[in-house]
Every structure is written in C-alpha cells, then in structure tokens.
C-alpha cells in the first residue's frame, strides 16, 4: 500500500511540477487539490484517485474508526442502552415474571409459618428467597442505569430500594437478621404487584388520594374524644373508676365505644345494686351522644371521602373515554365528507399492528442539565421576555415622538412671514432655503434635517443683520 501511495505522489508531482515544494506529503496533496479547484479544472490528484479505484489492486482502504468521533459513538451506545433498558423494565413479560416471583415468595412465607414445613423444605424456601432478592436487586440496578435521578422521583422505586437495602444488610449485620422483619418487608412488595392490576391500582390510588382528608377527620375525632374523656373523668371517675379513672383509661373506653363493640358491657357497669338512676340516665345520655357523633357520623365520614374520590376518578375516566369516542366519531365524519383525501381512521391504524412496538423518540440524554441550571435558564428566558416587552413599549413611544416631530413644518410659515416683512430679497432666499430644507428632510433623517435647518436659519438671520446695518 505504501508503494502505491508513493507511485501516486510521483505521478502527481510530475503532472503539476511541484517536486521541489516543501512540506509533508499530506500538505502537498491538499495544496495541489486546492490549486486545481481554483483553476476550474479537475485536480490531478482526484483523477489519480479515480483511476486507482478503478484498479482493484490499488484501492485505498479507509479505517472507519479514524473518521468517527469516539464521543459521539459512546453517546449513541449509551442512548441505545438506556432505550433497551427502559423497554425491558416496561415489558409486560418482565413485569409478569416479577409479579409471579413475588406471589410465589409470599406463598413460601405463608408456608414457613408452619414449623414442620419450614424445617422440611428449608433449602427450597431459602433458594426461592435468594432468587427473588437477586431479581429485585437487578431491578434496582437497571432502574439506576435507566436514569439515576429519575429513579428517585417514583415513590414505589424508593420503597423497593429500602426493602432491598434492608434485606441485603441482614447478610452483614446479624442484629437485623430477624425472620419476622424480613418476611414483613417481602410481603410489602405485594402492594406494588397490585398496582399492575388496573382495578386494584385504582382503589389504591383512591385510598392514597383520600389520606389528607382522612387525616383531617381523624384529628377531629381525636379532639372530640379528648373533650368527652375529660367529661367522663369529671362526671363518672368516682362512680365507675374501672372505665373513667384517668384520661388514658377514658380514651380507651371511648375508642371501644367508637368501634360499637363492647359498649354494652361498659354501660352495664353503671347499673349497680343500689340503682342510682341519675348515673344510669347520665351515662345513657353520655354514650348516646358520643356514639351518635363519633361512630355514626365520624366513621361514616371516612367512607364518604373514599367514595367521593372513587366517584370522581370514575367520572374522569368516563369523560376521557367519551372524549376519545367523540374524537373517533369526528374523524369518521370528516373522512366521509372529504372523499378526496385517502385518510386512514385512527381505529383502523390501532387495530393493524405490524412489526414491533415503537416508542416515540424522547430526545437525547441531558446528563449535564441539573435542576438549578434549568431554573436559571427559565429565569433568563423570563428576563429576556420582559426586556423584549419593555423594548417594544419604548420603541412604540419613540415612534410616536418621531411622528409628532416630523409633523412640525420647522416653523416655515412663521419664517416666511418674517422674511416677507423685511424684504422681498430675503423672501426669495427664504423660499429657496425652505425648498432646500424640504428636500433635505425627505432625503435625510430627522436629526440631520434639524441641524441643516438651524444652519440655514443662522445664515438667513446674519444676512438680514448685515442688510439692516448697511441701510443705517
């Protein structure tokens, strides 16, 4: 290959007559091609290369790695890796496998509660636990590869990481290697499996959405119980110390009354052998008011909140489905009206699936874009927009001022009257000067016209003064 290159170089230098030109071989080749291109004729180097490619024994092999940017290649590989990892994590087969393993692990945990089965199949149960833990660890690592900071924006991912982290610590710290804790953490993963089933996921989302309202109702019930516990200790503390001895005992008694289970046994303690009817009637009124407000109203508020949120979610889903149906019907009507356009309906396009499923390109990785940088960028955009708005206002005001100034005729009429009174000669000069000023104002901008007018006015005033002195 080197011999072929030397032969090309000698042939090219013999055609161009640049044998004595200094520089490296690559520089001389580039200079010869540039000179030939400037002269408007094909380069001898180009013709030589074309001839060489015509001869198989003298073809030049180009290494693709020498002309490829390694950084771009690495970015492409990283982007493709992230894309495939995202598809793997979202693939139904992977989700089904993970859910199946978690259900099997939950069944083994239930079977290990039996000491006989635990001892008999200890190795099998331990192997299943280790396999499930390994797959959970791989899921966390794949989530980090897909996007480390995006991983922490999902609450379920945080829960999975905490569970896996604690389960891994038990191999290094014996104090936390407690079977009850490990089994409880593994059972919590079943909640995430329920999110894969849409009806169950809808109910879980409704419950999570109702937590703030339920917390407010709980605070109200606790405040109500605290008030009635003070009343109970004050009124019945000496008569029934078993249930109203202090605040703690009274709160426990009222909690039993809210559950509506056991309040009859509590009220039976008010019926003593002496039959104090005042205490019995007072206790009956006390429990009636508390159970009516606390149990019937307070507990039902929880049901109302959850039911209302579920109804709102169902309505939102129905509205979205209705909008999709309306959009499909509108598309069908437009297709019937426009017979000239061979459009394909969206329902037909969705039904006809060919090849693999494709996801829209979401853009390249933004590894260097942090939240602080994004906030600063948004602030800069807002500042630029505000500056443009102020610039537009100032520009409009300047345009109005320019229009008003241009409407002034430079006091031409006043100057003509003054000059006509002085002399007819000065009047002709004024007429000439005013015409010149009009022409200049049309050709020049406003500032140059004002300067020219001032000069003409000074010259005309000097002429008038000289004429006035000569007359005297």
Swiss-Prot record:
Known tissue expression: Testis-specific.
Coiled-coil segments: none
Chain ranges on the Extracellular side, renumbered to this chain: 113-122, 178-180, 237-246, 259-279
Family per similarity comment: Belongs to the cation channel sperm-associated (TC 1.A.1.19) family.
Listed GO CC annotations: acrosomal vesicle; CatSper complex; plasma membrane; sperm principal piece
Main location: membrane
Taxonomic superkingdom: Eukaryota
UniProt feature: intramembrane region: 247-258
Catalytically driven reaction(s): Ca(2+)(in) = Ca(2+)(out)
Function comment: Pore-forming subunit of the CatSper complex, a sperm-specific voltage-gated calcium channel that plays a central role in calcium-dependent physiological responses essential for successful fertilization, such as sperm hyperactivation, acrosome reaction and chemotaxis towards the oocyte.
Localization of this protein: Cell projection, Cilium, Flagellum membrane
Region annotation (Disordered) ranges: 416-438
A Gene Ontology biological process term: sodium ion transport
Cytoplasmic side of membrane: 1-90, 150-153, 200-212, 308-472
Molecular-function annotations in GO: calcium-activated cation channel activity; voltage-gated calcium channel activity
Low complexity: bias regions: 423-432
PANTHER family: CATION CHANNEL SPERM-ASSOCIATED PROTEIN 4, ION_TRANS DOMAIN-CONTAINING PROTEIN
Protein's recorded name: Cation channel sperm-associated protein 4
Source organism per UniProt: Homo sapiens
Gene behind this protein: CATSPER4
Keywords for the protein's UniProt record, in alphabetical order: Calcium, Calcium channel, Calcium transport, Cell membrane, Cell projection, Cilium, Developmental protein, Differentiation, Flagellum, Ion channel, Ion transport, Membrane, Spermatogenesis, Transmembrane, Transmembrane helix, Transport, Voltage-gated channel
Activity-regulation annotation: The CatSper calcium channel is indirectly activated by extracellular progesterone and prostaglandins following the sequence: progesterone > PGF1-alpha = PGE1 > PGA1 > PGE2 >> PGD2. The CatSper calcium channel is directly inhibited by endocannabinoid 2-arachidonoylglycerol (2AG). Indirect activation by progesterone takes place via the following mechanism: progesterone binds and activates the acylglycerol lipase ABHD2, which in turn mediates hydrolysis of 2AG inhibitor, relieving inhibition of the CatSper channel.
